[in-house]
Structure formats: C-alpha cells, structure tokens
Amino acid sequence: MLPSAVGLEASDTLLSWKIGGLYKPAPNGSVYVNYALSQQPPGGANFTLSTAANNANNPNMDPQKAKTAELGTKWELMDKRLLLTGALFRTEITNEIVTNPDGTVGQTGKKIVQGLELGATGQISPAWGVTAGYTIQNTKVDTGATVAQDGSSGLTYTPKNAFSLWTSYQFPFGLTLAGGARYSGGLKRGTDGAVGTPNFTDAYWVFDAMASYRINKNADIQLNFYNLFDKEYVGAINKSGYRYFPGTPRSVRVSANFRF
C-alpha cells in the first residue's frame, strides 16, 4: 500500500477462490456451474489508505466481497453446424460503506447484478456464417443509498440490454463480405449536484461492415467500415454527465495481413 500523508500501513492475508463443475448429459451438450469469491482489502482499488471513518480505504474496514455464481449450458446441433449457449449469472457485492440515519457508518451495503446471456453461432452453409448474442441484466442497490440520479435502485453505467449480430459470406474467388449490428441500452449516471445533464444516455444501434480479399495463401487485405450510418451516441459518461466519451463516428480502416 502507498502510505497517505499520515503514514498509514496495513497488512493482512485474503483468500479469493473459484470452483466449477461440468456435466455432459449428451455427447453434443454440456452443463456447467461456477462459483467464485473475490475480496478487495481497504485501499485495494487505488493502493491508498485513509483515516476517514466513512472511507472504504480505512484499514479498520473489512474487505469488500464479491460472490459470483453462474449456471450455463452449451449444445452443438445440426451436425455441429449450430452452437447454442446460455448462462444465468448473479453477483453480490457486500461490505460496502453505508451511512446510518444517526450519522454513523457501517458495512451493510449490498449490490446485486443478475441476468441471462444467450449466444448462437451457426454455419448456414460452408460459406455463410452467422453469430448472435444477447444479454439482459438487472442491477440494484439491495442495501444502502441509491447511486443513480433518476432515484431508482439500479446501478450506474450498466445497460439493461445488449445485443450483437454478425454475418459473413466467403465467395469462392477469395472475397469475404460481412456485416452486423450492435445494440446497447441506455446508461444511468450517478448522483451528485450536477444541473442540466440527463439522468441517463439514450440506447443506440450501430451497424458495421467488412470486406476482405485473399491475395494468396500468405496475404490478404481487409477493409472495415465502422458505424455505417454515422450514428451519434454516447459510449460512456462520468458521474455528473458533464463529461462523456462519444461513440466512434463513421470511419474506415484498411489493413493487410501476412502469414509466413
């Protein structure tokens, strides 16, 4: 740890671990389960300790814990031309700092993130492939003060829905064409005294494309088109919403690949 101005020091030993299991009910399918516990000691986020009683970096505080559980499955269908995946996940973060009504602080804060992840990868023909993915997640402050400016119990900077789709086709003369779409739900900003900024960003769709040509077995050239319709969107925001990272505008990248 880096000492603060008053020269604080702290040392301890923490154990983070993960365990998992896999079961194959059929040759073409599997079911798995994972569980993990990770711990972050006071000062672990920025390697700085604090003497403030309500600060998570105070060495007298207990480590913050994250417990993550995942249950998923994978199946190969249609002579292995289609792969389907799905997973349920849940993460609980505990021991967060909470200010009590009497002004004292405790580590009763708890946040929860849980959701569902779906994926599909298919080969419609030897030349035509498709990949799709969808994630839905619910987030909330289970115990403690809300963190979102809109007053809801949801967490900030986390879209509820996300989707992606990509398809590609290989022509017999070395040309490959591909295209797809990306969707992200809106992002909530944090609570503070900012005035005039929205409580959340808008959801958005972005479309991309790609073309590549194989010159020979050792070289190919590739052309990527990002944000085809030049959609203006916010990729990320800070707590107040005064600063944000705009999404990538319409752009093109040319690259060459060589294999020896």
Regions found by a protein language model. Give the residues of each.
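Residues that define the transmembrane beta-barrel architecture of outer-membrane proteins
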Residues: S11-L15, K65-A69, I112-Q114, S153, ...
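Gram-negative outer-membrane beta-barrel transporters
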Residues: A87-E92, Q107-D192, F229, S255-R259
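Membrane-embedded beta-barrel scaffold of Gram-negative outer-membrane proteins
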Residues: K24, S30-S38, N60-L116, A120-D142, ...
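Signature of Gram-negative outer-membrane beta-barrel scaffolds
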Residues: M1-G29, P42
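C-terminal beta-signal and adjacent terminal beta-strands/loops
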Residues: Y183-D192, S212-F260
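Outer-membrane beta-barrel translocator domains and adjoining extracellular loop/strand segments
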Residues: M1-P3, G43-A52, E96-T104, Q137, ...
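Outer-envelope beta-barrel architecture signal
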Residues: P27-G29, K80-L82, P126-W128, N161-F163, ...
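Residues on the lipid-exposed face of transmembrane beta-strands in outer-membrane beta-barrel proteins
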Residues: I19-Y23, L71-W75, L118-G122, A132, ...
